[in-house]
Each structure stands twice: as structure tokens, then as C-alpha cells.
Amino acid sequence: MTTPAADLAPQPERPDRLETERLILRDFRLEDTEAVHAYGSDPEVTRYMPWGPNSPEDTAAFMARVLEQQATWPRLDLSLAIELKAEACVVGSIALHLRDIRNASVEMGYVLRRDLWGQGIVSEAAAAMTSLGFRLGLHRIAATCDVRNTGSYRVMEKLGMRREGCFRQDRQLRGAWRDTYLYAVLAEEWAAGRR
């Protein structure tokens, strides 16, 4: 049985840096602002996102928010920069957003620079974050995406998430209603799939 997130004591090692074969997932730094703005201002990258394309002011506000959140522990939102080791620069971000403390449930979100799509980078980062979440005692990790965002829901399916539903016209995106897929994976499903 997993422990509700509210009962978790702060971990001896804060999960502000994870390393995979090709990536470093780490806290943001002020000097990442230009790289963050490069992907956050790209209309194609933000096409299905509920935010963006970002202005320089939007990016500055995002950076101020994540840098402030990084100063606290435990965090309700664990947003990490995705750094590609080969480039030694930030190419995207990934986050776990605490949605339900009592039931140890979070929502995962991610974004990646367009020239790196289709290379398994988000899948690699998402697997590391999912493992971390369950090691920290989470029970359920969910993710949502616009139904037209095939790249995003393929990442969710690679993680072993199940499509739990489709919310019809649940939000407006740039003046038009969109449908949203909901995917999730439970701790025991993740453990069974990783044996």
C-alpha cells in the first residue's frame, strides 16, 4: 500500500536532479531563460498547449514562478528543466503537478523543443519522472492532452498509461473548443510493468 503524499516526510535527497542516459532533469536556473523562451515562444510547440506562444514577459513570469517554487520543499509542483547532455542546454521541461494530496495523485506535463521531437526524449524524461513519483509514494500519475496531439498521447501510452476517457469540448483553446484525452498509471501497474 502506498503512503498518501501528505504523510510523506521530506526525502533525505531532494529530487531536484535526475539523470538518464541522454538527459539531466534539473532545477531551472536564471540563465535558462533564453532557451526556455526559444521553445515557449514557438507557435508549433505551443499549438496544443493551454498557454503560449509566450512573449518575453510570459517567459520571465514563468521563470520567476519556478525559481520561487524551487526555494521551497516539499513542492506542490515539481518542474524540472530537460537538459540534453549532448548540447549542455535546456531543451524542454517536465513537471509533476500535485492535484490531490489526500489521494496521492499528480498530473504530469511536458514540453520539448520542436527540432528534437520524435527522438524519444520526452519518453525518457517522463519515465524518469514517473519512477521518481512512485518512489516518493504517489498512488496515481495522470496526464492530459488535446486529442489531436498524437505525439503527446503516444508518450503516455509508452509509459504504460491507460486512456481513461475523453472530455468533450472541455476547454477553449485560442477561440475554439477542444477535446481532451485523460491518461493515467497507478503505482502497482508501474511496478508490474517494470519487472
Residue positions per predicted region:
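Acyl-donor (CoA/ACP) binding surface of acyl/acetyltransferases
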Residues: M1-R47, A64, S79-R195
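A short gly/proline-enriched turn/hairpin at secondary-structure junctions
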Residues: T46-N54
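Hydrophobic residues in alpha-helical segments
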Residues: G40, M49, Q70-T72
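Active-site rim helix/loop that mediates acceptor-substrate recognition in acyltransferases
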Residues: S55-L76
